[in-house]
A protein has these predicted regions:
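C-terminal helical accessory/scaffold domains
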Residues: 410, 451-460, 464-639
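Conserved helix/coil segment N-terminal to the catalytic DExD/H
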Residues: 104-140
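Conserved segment of the helicase C-terminal RecA-like domain
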Residues: 329, 336, 348-384
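Conserved C-terminal RecA-like helicase domain
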Residues: 47, 72-73, 82-85, 89-99, ...
Length: 689
């Protein structure tokens, strides 16, 4: 079957070569099963690069062009969302409006209703189902990519809750679920009342093997060298960030690759904190959360470019669920990974298969190679039995008590947008989840858990249970705000109690509340990843006079210290030298804290703590730009960041009005501005007047 055999009315301009495009076997099977001709839900489980995404695209495009539909495409990570957005916009921008939304969880994002296809993260999908904007009812198709994330401890419950709520208030929506590794796909299909397409077919054959490296890393490096010499690219998975960078250095020391393109890439990724640019000149890079987004983007683009680009990337496990970076060979150097609270444990078989799925580039390789390293003959046999010949783990719902608490509150809040809710409707929601489908015999226990959770939520002020009718449950203002701000109940309580305590200390005791105290409040929340900083208590003691407050948030001191240095206008190299923290970690810390600061300012507003609200609102802007307070006016000029703002301030400009009145020649003299930017800068300052 060819693409031209399908009814592609309206898509001729997109698929101009349709007559020459032969559908892959899984694609043909899905088409024959009615994917494009019925309103059924579908679960499509097939290997990477077997054509799942194109099938989802065809479903969306047919709905848009033939039925005026609107579609959502949900993915697990921000980076993956942007990759899909760029890809879809390039391919379909001429016939459909493509949008993206990955943050701003409190907003119903009404602007999204103007788009035909919206790419969003699972978290954004979850937040929208809590807000239930009217435009969401007009969605005709929801594509859930990487649906096996339902089995992820952190993201799974939010995806599951979002899917259950969405199907409840929009029962006509079509759900297209995609996955490369989900052994119990029939179970998922039954939950979604979906047709199942399952296939093991790959466009490029895959060789899965155990690589014995009894003599150490030198044997692994020689194997990588061999592939590079033959013109191939290699992904090497290492179990830690430090390990991925260290192994990249080992490989770079043995490669003699060089090109003009690699030299240019080295310049792009050099921000003065480590030897990444030196590695890149040898055709090697590491890929982990140390990278700033700009560095990561440059590295990924180079690796995809084939030819004279990067040959080897040493990465951490998170890349397995990230952007598309196919390579001829994928090598897993370490299959045991450290998990907080569990120590070193073997990675799941599903993860290994997901990683191996990246091996073999269609149109480039005759076959792909997936290798997993063993250090002894006994270990080789164990790995072969467990990973090469073993069974995939079932995807199990991760609805723990904590996850259930958040999702029950989210459902109560979602119900409040319409007719309210009661115990029966909450139980109905729980009964519609994947968890309930997998645990039918446990529903009596689930009901008991629900009753206990409702009592706890009531005691903590998130909901009220009507005394005259204990079946009626309503979200309080605090509960509604917490859920809409996308806070865990624990974080919402931390913010409420912290804001009230700091406000009282300042008003009643005359305690000076520093910016660092406010940052530490934010860093106590679950959403912020703790960063390790040497001598953190000594540093913190110089930033706050409130010793009791410092000890209460000791585990979060590192993140607060890094954020404080950021708003103090410290540079990446300075922070790396002083704290040992990398640009990517700083960026992630600042990104999350910016949102948490906004959430805290909204919480302070709700609590009528006006001084705290004003302080937090200002702090939010400083976190966003990484500036001291004297630059707040200057960064309001479009296109002005922390470096140019400080240059303007040092040159005597205090605010947009002074910039607007300046001569172009004056602005040209400011470091970082120059002739090209000066005119634009003045124009933007005038707009601020």
């Amino acid at each position: 079957m060819k693409l031209s055999d399908l009814n592609l009315k309206g898509l001729e301009s997109v698929f101009v070569d349709a007559n020459d495009v032969e559908l892959f076997p899984p694609q043909e099977e899905a088409i024959r099963a009615g994917l494009l001709d019925t309103g059924k839900n579908f679960v499509i489980a097939s290997p990477t690069a077997s054509g799942k995404t194109l099938l989802a695209e065809l479903v969306m495009l047919k709905s848009i062009l033939h039925a005026s539909g609107k579609c959502l495409y949900a993915v697990p990570l921000n980076a993956l969302a942007y990759e899909k957005y760029q890809n879809f916009k390039a391919k379909y921008g001429g016939i459909a409006k493509v949008g993206i939304s990955t943050g701003d969880y409190e907003s119903s994002s009404r602007y999204l209703e103007r788009y035909d296809i919206v790419i969003l993260t699972f978290e954004k999908l979850d937040s929208l189902t809590r807000l239930k904007p009217a435009w969401l009812r007009r969605i005709s198709v929801v594509v859930v990519d990487e649906v096996h994330v339902l089995g992820d401890e952190k993201r799974g419950p939010r995806l599951e809750g979002a899917m259950a709520r969405f199907m409840s208030f929009n029962p006509r929506v079509r759900v297209i679920a995609l996955s490369a590794t989900i052994p119990n796909a029939e179970e998922l299909g039954n939950w979604l009342q979906a047709s199942l397409i399952r296939s093991e077919w790959r466009p490029v054959p895959l060789k899965e093997e155990v690589f014995l490296a009894a003599k150490g890393d030198r044997e692994i490096i020689e194997r990588v060298e061999k592939e590079v010499e033959e013109g191939s690219q290699v992904l090497v998975f290492v179990n830690t960030k430090r390990g991925s960078a260290s192994f990249a250095r080992k490989i770079a020391a043995h490669l003699t690759v060089s090109s003009k393109e690699l030299g240019e890439l080295a310049e792009r990724v050099d921000i003065g904190v480590d030897d990444l640019s030196d590695l890149v000149r040898h055709g090697v890079a590491y890929h982990n959360s140390w990278l700033h987004p700009a560095q990561r983007k440059a590295i990924e683009e180079s690796f995809r470019s084939k030819g004279a680009g990067l040959k080897v990337i040493c990465c951490t496990p998170t890349l397995a669920m990230g952007v598309s970076l196919p390579a001829k060979m994928v090598l897993i150097r370490n299959y045991r990974f450290f998990t907080l609270g569990r120590g070193n444990e073997p990675m799941p078989v599903c993860w290994v298969k997901q990683v191996f799925g990246r091996a073999g580039r269609p149109e480039h390789d005759k076959y792909g190679i997936g290798l997993i390293v063993a250090r002894s003959e006994d270990e080789r046999e164990e790995i072969e039995d467990f990973y090469i010949n073993g069974d995939l783990e079932r995807t199990e719902s991760q609805f723990s008590a904590a996850a259930m608490t958040e999702q029950i509150l989210a459902t109560i809040v979602a119900g409040a947008n319409h007719i309210g809710t009661d115990r029966a409707s909450i139980l109905e929601f729980l009964d519609s989840t994947f968890y309930a489908y997998q645990n039918r015999t446990q529903m009596a226990l689930v009901k008991a858990q629900m009753d206990g959770i409702l009592e706890d939520l009531s005691d903590e002020g998130f909901i009220t249970i009507t005394k005259s009718n204990e079946e009626e449950v309503k979200a309080t203002g605090f509960g509604m705000l917490s859920s809409r701000l996308y806070l865990s109940t624990k974080s919402a309580l931390e913010l409420r109690e912290g804001i009230l305590s700091l406000d009282a200390w300042e008003r009643e005791k005359g305690t000076k509340i520093s910016d660092f105290d406010l940052l530490l409040l934010l860093c106590k929340c679950d959403e912020v990843v703790p960063l390790k900083v040497k001598a953190s208590m000594e540093i913190a003691a110089n930033l706050s006079d409130n010793i009791e407050w410092l000890y209460g948030g000791a585990y979060a001191l590192g993140s607060a210290i890094v954020a404080h240095a950021w708003i103090g206008e410290r540079t990446y190299p300075e922070m790396k030298e002083k704290f040992g923290i990398y640009p990517g970690e700083i960026h992630n810390d600042v990104y999350v804290l910016g949102w948490m600061c906004y959430a805290a300012s909204r919480m302070a507003e709700f609590l009528q703590a006006e001084n705290m609200r004003a302080r937090l609102s200002m702090l939010k802007d400083r976190i966003r730009h990484g500036i001291k307070t004297d630059l707040l006016g200057l960064v309001s000029i479009r296109g002005v960041g922390r470096v140019i703002a400080r240059g303007l301030h040092s040159a005597g400009f205090q605010n947009p009005a002074e910039v607007a009145k300046a001569d172009i020649t004056q602005l040209e003299m400011v470091p970082g501005v120059g002739k090209k930017r000066a005119k634009k800068l003045k124009e933007e300052a005038l707009r601020r007047m």
